[in-house]
């Protein structure tokens, strides 16, 4: 069995007058995130982790913010495309672990819905998906409520022929 680990990281600042979408879930908050796509910083980090595990670069390479085709793009569609690239190479998801770093809004009430989105889009069991949140104790840009950062790690496996 061949196993690969991928790590993804993404950051977006608050400031857009739009819904705040995190992991495909609309989270009530006073503002959305500034981005070329829908700004789903969680799915961007997971997509980057999958691409990293496959040595395929990052989401900026596959979905450049200079391409108007991705203006306002649904990040769930982008995530599924990244996972399709992995499946085309014979890989499947082992598990995903996500850490959302934000002083606000409160993430905990939305974690189960976020896990379900990832399980659905990655065709995984719910117990293979972990989403957690933390703060930076009011330090740095996330602590000042200027934006959200996310780290994601995926384990991908392929049976050897």
Swiss-Prot record:
Positions of a divalent metal cation binding: 10, 12, 44
Cofactor descriptive note: Binds 1 divalent metal cation per subunit.
Catalytic activity: 4-CDP-2-C-methyl-D-erythritol 2-phosphate = 2-C-methyl-D-erythritol 2,4-cyclic diphosphate + CMP
GO molecular function per UniProt: 2-C-methyl-D-erythritol 2,4-cyclodiphosphate synthase activity; metal ion binding
UniProt-annotated binding residues for 4-CDP-2-C-methyl-D-erythritol 2-phosphate: 10-12, 36-37, 58-60, 63-67, 134-137, 141, 144
Keywords of the record: Isoprene biosynthesis, Lyase, Metal-binding
GO biological process: isopentenyl diphosphate biosynthetic process, methylerythritol 4-phosphate pathway; terpenoid biosynthetic process
Site (Transition state stabilizer): 36, 135
Domain of life: Bacteria
Cofactor: a divalent metal cation
Pathways involved: Isoprenoid biosynthesis; isopentenyl diphosphate biosynthesis via DXP pathway; isopentenyl diphosphate from 1-deoxy-D-xylulose 5-phosphate: step 4/6
Purpose of the protein: Involved in the biosynthesis of isopentenyl diphosphate (IPP) and dimethylallyl diphosphate (DMAPP), two major building blocks of isoprenoid compounds. Catalyzes the conversion of 4-diphosphocytidyl-2-C-methyl-D-erythritol 2-phosphate (CDP-ME2P) to 2-C-methyl-D-erythritol 2,4-cyclodiphosphate (ME-CPP) with a corresponding release of cytidine 5-monophosphate (CMP).
Family (UniProt): Belongs to the IspF family.
NCBIfam families tied to this protein: ispF (TIGR00151)
Quaternary state and interactors: Homotrimer.
Protein name according to UniProt: 2-C-methyl-D-erythritol 2,4-cyclodiphosphate synthase
Gene behind this protein: ispF
């Amino acid at each position: 069995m061949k196993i690969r680990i991928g790590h993804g990281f993404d950051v977006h600042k608050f400031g857009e007058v739009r819904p705040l979408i995190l992991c495909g879930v609309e989270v009530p908050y006073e503002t959305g995130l500034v981005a070329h796509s829908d700004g789903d910083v969680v799915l961007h980090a997971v997509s980057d982790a999958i691409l990293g595990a496959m040595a395929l670069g990052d989401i900026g390479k596959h979905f450049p913010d200079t391409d108007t085709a991705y203006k306002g793009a649904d990040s769930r569609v982008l995530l599924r495309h990244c996972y399709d690239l992995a499946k085309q190479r014979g890989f499947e998801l082992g598990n995903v672990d996500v850490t959302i770093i934000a002083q606000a809004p409160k993430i905990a009430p939305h974690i189960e819905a976020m896990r379900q989105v990832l399980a659905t889009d990655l065709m995984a069991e719910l117990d293979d998906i972990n989403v957690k949140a933390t703060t930076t104790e009011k330090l740095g840009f996330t602590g000042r409520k200027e934006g959200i950062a996310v780290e994601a790690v995926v384990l991908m496996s392929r049976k050897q022929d």
